[in-house]
Design a protein with these regions (language model features):
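Short secondary-structure junctions
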Residues: 35-48, 92-96, 303-311
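Short amphipathic alpha-helices in soluble, non-transmembrane regions
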Residues: 81-87, 341-346
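Conserved catalytic core of two-metal-ion nucleotidyltransferases
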Residues: 82-129, 313-326
């Protein structure tokens, strides 16, 4: 059964001849354009294909072509960025190019549904990294040499498996398994099935690969071209544990449904009522920047709500339509008791207990020493309603909220707090569904 499912998955994961011809035609066209512009620049050494296209591990549903422009290592950072962008814009000018940002800017365009990236990097020896993209050409050479044809197909299957189940992508929004990580896992373990077997029995902090260093992350994956680099450091604990659970389920009861899109639109009303959604608009910026900011904002607000007595079960974030974002919080309850117990020091600690009594005596409804000799006080909460508290926190105490400075101007222009059961944007609705529903693929009892 399992072998039959893996065989069927190839029809989804492996491109057909029509798709191959389409991407090859565009790749050759664009490479010629980029190479022509690069030859005009004395700082450029050479131009190469990179990424999944060059390694033959690309999948049909997302067609990308990466073209790397190698610069002399003596090129200044300013010229590296300026000339890199010029080559990208001049070569792709017919296709409405635009700038995207990683550590350094690169130029991207869409050509008949195929994403084309023109990425600058330095011509250096292995280990002499000057920019984040410098390793990429070494990755391409290594994987092109080491991966067999069947292993490349298994990389494609693994990518599709992770994409469909929400664990694929290195961007901050996802914090999942990157395309290169998929290649590395298949390189180390030999096949898609072996990767799942390894993940199903994974121990905390287990290392895949070899390194002289020790790393602290739930999953350690050593970059085969840089033994001091842990590729697993960027993968969230949620994605690691979800992969473990799904791998166990697939090996126990395989199904092609693991490779097919699932509906995420159902929203349990009971839990939706206990969900708060903070909506706001922001000035346009890169996805990595906005997601880094809204994730920090959600984490800080969650901590503030817990301090105030509201039990936050889960939180999430989503950015959409280029200038809109939402922070989502699932609470145990939106309202809590007006009474709050605050614990103090032991009576035997003379100075501390005296100070506690002085500070709390006026606002206390009741004060006593419990059976362990600790002081306790019953007080009236400032807030009984989570939405009321959250509104006041953002509106009147923004500087103390923990929301990053880079977002505060956006919040000052306005925000709105909705309940999870209210009518929502499609992207927000999908995020609410993910937040408050059990993923049956991950948590199957079969």
């Amino acid at each position: 059964m399992k072998n039959d499912v893996i065989k069927k998955s190839k029809q989804i994961a492996i491109p057909n001849n029509t798709q191959r011809k389409k991407i090859d035609k565009i790749a050759n066209q664009v490479f010629s354009l980029v190479n022509r512009e690069a030859e005009k620049q004395k700082a450029v050494v050479s131009v190469h294909f990179g990424g999944s296209y060059a390694k033959e591990t690309w999948t049909p549903e997302k067609l990308d072509i990466d073209i790397f422009v190698k610069f002399k290592k003596t090129t200044s950072e300013k010229n590296f960025e300026t000339i890199g962008k010029k080559i990208g814009f001049d070569s792709l000018k017919k296709f409405k190019p635009y700038v995207r940002y990683s550590e350094h800017p690169f130029v991207e365009a869409d050509i008949n549904g195929v994403g084309v990236n023109v990425v600058p990097c330095y011509d250096i020896k292995k280990g002499e990294w000057k920019s984040a993209a410098d390793r990429s050409t070494f990755h391409t050479e290594f994987m092109s040499e080491k991966l067999t044809g069947s292993m490349k197909d298994d990389v494609r299957i693994l990518k599709c498996f992770l994409k469909i189940n929400g664990m694929y992508g290195a961007e901050i929004a996802k914090q999942g398994f990157s395309g290169y990580v998929c290649e590395v896992l298949v390189y180390y373990l030999g096949s898609f099935e072996n990767v799942l077997k390894k993940m199903s029995k994974l121990k905390n902090n287990e290392m895949i690969g070899e390194s002289p260093r020790k790393f602290e992350s739930p999953l350690v994956i050593i970059d085969p071209i840089d033994r001091n680099r842990n590729l697993g450091a960027a993968i969230s604990i949620q994605n690691v544990t979800n992969f473990i659970l799904i791998a166990r389920n697939f090996l126990k009861k395989s199904s092609i449904s693991y490779f097919k899109e699932k509906s995420k639109d159902r929203i349990p009303v009971e839990l939706a009522k206990n969900t708060l959604v903070v909506n706001f608009k922001y000035k346009k910026r890169s996805d990595d920047i906005i997601y880094g900011q809204i994730k920090r904002a959600a984490s800080s607000i969650e901590s503030q709500m817990i301090k105030e007595g509201f039990n936050v079960l889960r939180s999430d974030t989503v950015a959409f339509d280029e200038t809109k974002a939402s922070l989502l919080f699932l609470l145990e309850s939106l309202t809590i008791s007006k009474n709050e117990i605050r614990s103090g020091p032991y009576v035997f600690s003379s100075d501390f207990s005296t100070k506690f009594i002085q500070v709390n005596s006026k606002k206390s409804k009741l004060m006593w020493a419990d059976n362990e000799g600790k002081l306790q006080t019953l007080q009236t909460r400032r807030y009984e309603n989570a939405k009321t508290y959250l509104t006041d926190l953002i509106k009147n105490h923004l500087g103390e909220s923990g929301i990053p400075k880079g977002l505060r101007a956006d919040f000052k222009t306005g925000f709105k707090i909705n309940n999870g059961k209210d009518k929502q944007n499609k992207s927000v609705k999908k995020s609410i569904s993910k937040l408050i529903t059990t993923d049956d693929t991950t948590f199957s009892a079969n």
